[in-house]
Amino acid sequence: MQVADSEGWSIQDSAALYGLDRWGEPYFTINGRGHISVQPQGERGGSLDLVELVSELRGRNLGLPLLIRFDDILEDRLERLHAAFERAIAQYSYTGRYQGVFPVKCNQQRHVVEELVICGKRWNFGLEAGSKAELLIALSLLDDPEALLICNGYKDRLYIETAILARRLGRQPVVVIEQPDEVDRIIEASKSLGAAPYIGVRAKLSSRSTGRWGSSVGDKAKFGLSIPELLATVERLRESNLLPDLRLLHFHIGSQINDIAVLKDALQEAGQIYVELTRLGAPMGFLDVGGGLGIDYDGSRTASAASTNYSLQNYANDVVATVRECCEPNAVAVPTLVSESGRAIASHFSLLVFDVLGSSALSASIPNASGDEPLTVRNLRDTLVTIQELSGTADAQLVRLQEAWNDALKFKQDALAAFRLGYMGLPDRASAEQLTWACADAIAQRLPKEQAIPEELAALSKALAGTYYANLSIFRSAPDTWAIDQLFPVVPIQKLNQRPTRLANLADLTCDSDGRLDRFIGDGQPKQLLELHELDDNNPYLIGLFLSGAYQEVMGNLHNLFGTTNAVHIRLSPGGSYRIDHVVRGDTNADVLEAMEHDPRVLLERLRVAAEAAINDGQLRIDESRRLLDHLESSLRQTTYLQD
């Protein structure tokens, strides 16, 4: 569907339209060429033209879709997180410190975790593991003896013993008791090894959370100890002489806290539990406030599911101030504050760039009239003329537009009935459909801008909208858009100095009707259509999916056997250039076949046998067989996505 001409448009208009000046700060802006620029170090300077960068990466045989990871942004996020807590600690005269950890589950990619460990050493920044495999990752990469290694998740004897033995490697693991039956395993493992880990307990808070992850707290939460279970755990540790090793209280109220009031309530409850644990004789020392530090996906700065009604500094201030208010009146030393802020750290540093392969839309063009058109087709032509000639007040026009659309639908049904009975040919049916959509387009163009619109008429814009076919798999690269209706910023990375004249949604490569993007960042509310530009046959149309660095890669799947995309790690160089630190090649067709236990060699051999049989039957020449097998071998080495 066309929305407007392209005159009188500026990059400021595009920034406002796509919310770039809200969610993009301080890393993404629009430059004078109408391209998105990336400032990986934020306000400290240095920028890269994203379109030029993609062009140069494609010149290095890194095809689209392409995942671009800016390691400078990862480091900058760490710096901002620690700076916020340092300011809060100074403002509230907090005598403790902040010591964060990165939850490995957010992004287990080796280069990502390595980068965080290296950048985080100056703050003794640690890692959080939620499984045995993640524990092994953390043990191999985390070499700072002062950094915390928080051990969460379900734990068997092997998990616990591995964590205990890690202390002898100079690590500082904290085994967090999340289920009552883990207490006895820790006691037995400690006796067997003659050593104990630092121990933590996770409390189930009664404070209610909101949003998509509200069930993370409360009596029915998946993890954590109820208050009676917490007291029983303390007594069991005391009986086993392990109470001196109880050092940490942990809670978690959701992956994306959208309302700061929820955090304040939880902090007050957890702060009092911490005080009571010290009164019961536990030395304590650490309070882990879990994850939940959200990011503003849609830039609205509200308590919506895709936003937050607080800033990073607000978050740090409330954590520091509330914990101090709980501890100081009770003469309890304030703890070292720990957070597992994976989403806030990792989301910004990674973006996916993909190209558009083509588009389609319903035809609203007006067919030429013929002398022997059926009555239903003539009725549709008359209805279109009526719509085009409407005048009067907005209220009166709206009533007449609804009446006209009702007429158009009736005439379309009459035409379909005539076709089914054999009274109408295919050309006349095509004319009836085109005229129906021409009526819809004329109505959509005339709907009042500032007036409540009947739902049926409001839906016409979506029905008329086009579909842009994107070279990606939603299930692989942005699974949360399908699974939980997560909003991500989706923006063309070029032509932003031109008015977008098309409304469309995005369909991916999979043979699945769910494989589409049809919820986009709007002005306060999600919108179903995205403003896009006309496609140019001579130049690729590039779109970016932003803020996708947390969870998306690891949760992506092999639906339709679309594999991982190419990925590249970029760092700014002095003088405004960049360097490529790592290239991670995406899956080939052979890779995904092997993942499903199809041996590419066996596959080729079967096809070779089939080709020989075709030669013997005279269906295939020898040179054609060779060309076919060469083509198949080449396909196995190629990416699972479409190429130029």
Swiss-Prot record:
The GO molecular function terms of this record are: arginine decarboxylase activity; metal ion binding
Which transformation does this protein catalyse, written as a reaction? L-arginine + H(+) = agmatine + CO2
Q: Does the keyword Magnesium apply?
A: yes
Q: Does the keyword Magnesium apply?
A: yes
- Please give the biological process terms from Gene Ontology that the record holds: arginine catabolic process; spermidine biosynthetic process
Task: State where substrate binds.
Answer: L287, D288, V289, G290, G291, G292, L293, G294, I295, D296, Y297
Q: Which InterPro entries match?
A: Ala_racemase/Decarboxylase_C, Arg_decarb_HB, Arg_decarbox_C, Arg_decrbxlase, De-COase2_CS, De-COase2_N, De-COase2_pyr-phos_BS, Orn/DAP/Arg_de-COase
Q: Which Pfam families match?
A: Arg_decarb_HB (PF17810), Arg_decarbox_C (PF17944), Orn_Arg_deC_N (PF02784)
**Keyword field:** Decarboxylase, Lyase, Magnesium, Metal-binding, Polyamine biosynthesis, Pyridoxal phosphate, Spermidine biosynthesis
Instruction: Using the record's annotations, give every residue carrying the modification N6-(pyridoxal phosphate)lysine.
Output: K105
Q: What is its EC number?
A: 4.1.1.19
What PROSITE patterns does this protein map onto? ODR_DC_2_1, ODR_DC_2_2
Class of the enzyme per the UniProt entry, highest EC level: lyase
Report which superkingdom the organism of origin falls in: Bacteria
Which coenzymes or cofactors are required? Mg(2+); pyridoxal 5'-phosphate
NCBIfam families of this UniProt entry?
PRK05354.1, speA
Q: Which family does it belong to?
A: Belongs to the Orn/Lys/Arg decarboxylase class-II family. SpeA subfamily.
- Entry function: Catalyzes the biosynthesis of agmatine from arginine.
Please identify the protein, giving its name as recorded: Biosynthetic arginine decarboxylase
**Origin organism of this chain?**
Parasynechococcus marenigrum (strain WH8102)
